[in-house]
Design a protein with these regions (language model features):
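A secondary-structure boundary/capping signal
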Residues: 1-2, 77, 102, 117, ...
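Active-site-proximal alpha-helical scaffold in enzymes
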Residues: 109-116
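PLP-dependent aminotransferase class I/II
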Residues: 34, 46-50, 55, 59-61, ...
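Conserved active-site segment immediately N-terminal to the catalytic lysine
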Residues: 75-107, 135-140
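Nucleotide-sugar-dependent glycosyltransferase donor-binding/catalytic pocket residues
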Residues: 5, 29, 54-55, 102-108, ...
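PLP-dependent aminotransferase-like
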Residues: 1-77, 84
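Histidine-centered beta-alpha loop that forms part of the nucleotide-sugar donor binding/catalytic region
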Residues: 3-4, 17, 24, 78-79, ...
Length: 186
């Protein structure tokens, strides 16, 4: 979806991908599932839904499309910490990416997290984040230093503990604002 922060697209471009945008649903601001299949080409390798403002993209039809075309799902959950889709956490449908930047619902000051239930992907990500090193001075690939510091981990742990309370407060605020807006004449 083009309705996201540039970092989403930068990650794809840095991986050598060609990005093909699909518009958003005007109600949810998430990927418009009805447009996805028409955008798929023989070169397509993944669908990258963006979960936005705590709202999950419509994952069931996206998963069906991905399965039908043998595509990966790479979720941008940077603005949806703790969000659910039919009882399942966003970031659990394929490879999920979360941002811990200071403006997010949960922060470590900077950085992020990748989630996956694919052991091979998890192994590769661990290598990439630690200079390509599997064991002390055993390097298997080119990597980078993308490790979280102990201080960031401590902040993140504290943030995780209060995340449910934050989410509930945001939901209550949204409900209150919606109620007030509903009273306005258009």
């Amino acid at each position: 979806s083009p309705f996201t922060f540039v970092a989403t697209v930068n990650a794809m471009l840095n991986a050598g991908a060609t990005v093909r945008f699909v518009d958003i649903d005007p109600v949810t601001y998430c990927l418009d599932v009805s447009q996805v299949e028409a955008a798929i080409t023989p070169a397509t390798v993944a669908i990258a839904p963006v979960h936005l403002y705590g709202l999950a993209a419509d994952m069931a039809p996206l998963m069906a499309i991905a399965l039908r075309h043998s595509l990966a799902i790479i979720e941008d959950a940077a603005q949806a910490h703790g969000a659910l889709y039919k009882g399942a956490r966003v970031g659990s449908f394929g490879v999920g990416s979360f941002s811990f930047y200071a403006t997010k619902n949960m922060t470590t000051g900077e950085g992020g997290m990748v989630t996956t239930n694919d052991d091979a992907v998890a192994d590769r990500l661990r290598l990439l984040r630690n200079q390509g090193m599997r064991a002390r001075y055993e390097y298997e690939m080119v990597g980078r230093n993308a490790r979280m510091t102990d201080l960031q981990a401590a902040v993140g742990t504290a943030e995780l503990e209060i995340l449910p309370e934050r989410i509930e407060r945001r939901r209550a605020n949204a409900a209150g604002l919606t109620e007030q807006l509903d009273d306005l004449e258009t």
